[in-house]
Amino acid sequence: MKTTSLKPAEVDKKWIVIDAEGLVVGRLASIVAMRLRGKHKAAYTPHVDCGDNVIVINAEKVKFTGRKYNQKSYFYHTGYPGGIKERTAKFILEGRFPERVVEKAVERMLPRGPLFRQILGNLRVYKGTEHPHEAQQPQALDVGALNRKNVSA
């Protein structure tokens, strides 16, 4: 039997919506990263973007386990000498763009390769329940029902 290798024209991309309310960030990010790459499909091809389009809503309501909400640090650099800055997860989630926590978690679980930017472009994260992708008729994926540890108590 021959190994199937998909061509870009043969890829069937679906739209998936995930409600992140009460979900653990790392567990959510690993499931989203797998869906974005297409590794859940039998016809996965490493050199072709065969993953689905994923919409994550309620990103400001994600949970951290342990003390990570107060202690986890995110670093960035301003570009100037000595310009390293640090923000906690609490500061980001209570700020203007809480969806960055989910975006960074997923981004750091994807491999840095030729398809990285293209795959990351298939991720849409929104802080509220509203999203502008109703025309694509996304299917809901209940991540909390996949494993009881995905939901924080």
From Swiss-Prot:
Keywords (alphabetical) are:
Ribonucleoprotein, Ribosomal protein
> InterPro entries attached here?
Ribosomal_uL13, Ribosomal_uL13_bac-type, Ribosomal_uL13_sf
The superkingdom listed in its UniProt entry is Bacteria
Entry GO CC? cytosolic large ribosomal subunit
Q: What does this protein do?
A: This protein is one of the early assembly proteins of the 50S ribosomal subunit, although it is not seen to bind rRNA by itself. It is important during the early stages of 50S assembly.
Q: Which family does it belong to?
A: Belongs to the universal ribosomal protein uL13 family.
Protein name, UniProt field: Large ribosomal subunit protein uL13
Q: Which organism is it from?
A: Methylobacterium radiotolerans (strain ATCC 27329 / DSM 1819 / JCM 2831 / NBRC 15690 / NCIMB 10815 / 0-1)
